[in-house]
């Protein structure tokens, strides 16, 4: 198939039908009506806004999650915004059908209406970037900017989103670190089409900075501060937010996810296929992968605290890195790690280490040498210095249990206790983690060849 045929076939699968558009339109109208009624009943000074892909008409067929933001006046205190926002969310959630409380920067309500998820999020009714108080406030400005600038390129955005999903590079959440929907929209608006964005994959990386609203001219000092910060943190791409010069829209984008986009873009342009958009599921056996690699898999399973992914998973990542570092200090080579809400994977070169630990000591004719001699059971001389040895645990599970028991590892503050109380598995994972284990061991997560 040539590239035009591939794109035509993909568009048939990702562009909402007229019936679907009517369903979404009716759904949003009903939710808006119920929201306005609830605001009036509670006598609140607030205004509802739809944000996200549904509001911008860049959603993919079948993807109907609703983002409903309740905007309060700027003179509302943060405490009052949280309190009234949550109160409204609960009443509206009850009216829509069912709901639960979720937690991010502040609590919000996640409801369900006609089988569709509806996030009800309180925010400030900002008019420009100088009014922004909380992380979610910009969302209303983002929606306005995209609607003003997209100019009929909605399907180009859909193509880019589906491509990014297909190559496993979509989602700006901290545990994914890929392209956000808003970033995809900006790139289409900036470069004009899906194919142009792919063709610019190398150019973007070298140019590094994209500034759609010329903030460098309008607010040069603030924008340069943003650029210096992001360059200092070695970000692969800097996209100055069209609505706020203080923010890099690509701040969460990792080098690994951009690398997937970089290689897959070139591959698609060379050999176009619908496979990039709708890949076949990678099926494999983690035990076979272990046998072929001649390595070992250590799995820590635990019961996580009730936190949203954006808060929990960075803590799990920090813990995984801390345990990896400690195991390496204990003499084990850790070839890689991965993690999720309830697990940490560590691939190691061996399960046992040497049974003794040799410690180099001070000069034998010093006071330190005398204390070293008295403190240790087995001591010998190497030149002018003393050395000693002591027996140590050899099996990695014993070593790991000691590390956990003594708390000798860096960990997220909310998760350390859960890790310590969890289980340690060797070369085996529960059935529900077998796919994750295979993707980890096969390196499929970031594999480009």
UniProtKB/Swiss-Prot annotation:
PANTHER family: CCA-ADDING ENZYME. GO terms for biological process: RNA repair; tRNA 3'-terminal CCA addition. This is CCA-adding enzyme. Belongs to the tRNA nucleotidyltransferase/poly(A) polymerase family. Archaeal CCA-adding enzyme subfamily. Homodimer. The lineage of its organism: Archaea, Methanobacteriati, Methanobacteriota, Thermococci, Thermococcales. GO terms for molecular function: ATP binding; CCA tRNA nucleotidyltransferase activity; magnesium ion binding; tRNA binding. Keywords: ATP-binding, Magnesium, Metal-binding, Nucleotide-binding, Nucleotidyltransferase, RNA repair, RNA-binding, Transferase, tRNA processing. A single active site specifically recognizes both ATP and CTP and is responsible for their addition. SUPFAM superfamilies: Nucleotidyltransferase, PAP/Archaeal CCA-adding enzyme, C-terminal domain, PAP/OAS1 substrate-binding domain. It comes from Pyrococcus horikoshii (strain ATCC 700860 / DSM 12428 / JCM 9974 / NBRC 100139 / OT-3). Pfam families: CAA_C, NTP_transf_2, tRNA_NucTransf2. It is an enzyme of class 2 (transferase). CTP binds at residues 53, 56, 142, 161, 170. ATP binds at residues 53, 56, 142, 161, 170. Its EC number is 2.7.7.72. Its cofactor is Mg(2+).
């Amino acid at each position: 198939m040539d590239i035009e045929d591939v794109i035509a076939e993909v568009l048939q699968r990702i562009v909402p039908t007229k019936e679907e558009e009517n369903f979404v339109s009716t759904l949003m109208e009903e939710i808006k009506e119920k929201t306005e009624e609830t605001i009036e009943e509670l006598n609140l000074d607030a205004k509802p806004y739809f944000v996200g892909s549904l509001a911008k008409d860049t959603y993919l067929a079948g993807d109907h999650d609703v983002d409903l933001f309740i905007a309060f006046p700027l003179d509302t205190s943060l405490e009052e915004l949280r309190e009234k926002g949550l109160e409204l969310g609960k009443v509206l959630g009850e009216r829509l059908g069912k709901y639960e409380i979720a937690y991010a920067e502040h609590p919000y309500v996640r409801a369900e209406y006609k089988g569709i998820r509806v996030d009800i999020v309180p925010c400030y009714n900002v008019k420009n970037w100088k009014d922004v108080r909380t992380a979610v406030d910009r969302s209303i400005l983002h929606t306005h900017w995209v609607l003003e600038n997209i100019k009929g390129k909605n399907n180009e955005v859909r193509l880019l989103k589906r491509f990014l999903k297909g190559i496993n590079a979509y989602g700006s959440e901290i545990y994914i670190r890929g392209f956000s929907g808003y970033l995809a929209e900006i790139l289409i608006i900036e470069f004009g089409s899906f194919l142009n964005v792919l063709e610019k994959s190398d150019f973007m990386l070298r140019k590094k900075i994209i500034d759609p609203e010329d903030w460098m001219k309008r607010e040069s000092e603030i924008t340069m501060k943003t650029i210096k910060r992001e360059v200092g943190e070695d970000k692969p791409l800097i996209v100055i937010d069209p609505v706020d010069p203080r923010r890099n829209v690509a701040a969460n984008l990792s080098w690994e996810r951009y690398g997937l986009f970089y290689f897959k873009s070139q591959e698609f342009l060379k050999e176009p296929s619908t496979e990039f958009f709708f890949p076949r599921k990678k099926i494999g056996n983690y035990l076979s992968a272990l046998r072929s690699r001649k390595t070992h898999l250590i799995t820590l399973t635990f019961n996580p605290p009730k936190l949203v992914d954006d808060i929990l998973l960075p803590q799990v990542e920090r813990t995984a890195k801390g345990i990896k570092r400690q195991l390496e200090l204990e003499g084990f080579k850790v070839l890689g790690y991965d993690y999720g809400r309830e697990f940490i994977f560590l691939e190691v070169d061996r399960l046992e280490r040497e049974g003794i630990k040799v410690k180099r000591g001070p000069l034998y004719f010093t006071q330190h040498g005398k204390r070293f001699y008295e403190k240790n059971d087995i001591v010998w001389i190497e030149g002018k210095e003393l050395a000693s040895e002591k027996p140590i645990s050899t099996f990695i599970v014993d070593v790991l249990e000691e590390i956990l028991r003594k708390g000798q590892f860096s960990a997220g503050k909310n998760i350390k206790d859960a890790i310590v109380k969890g289980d340690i598995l060797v070369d085996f994972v529960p059935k529900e983690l077998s796919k994750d284990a295979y993707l980890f061991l096969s390196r499929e997560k970031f594999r480009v060849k």
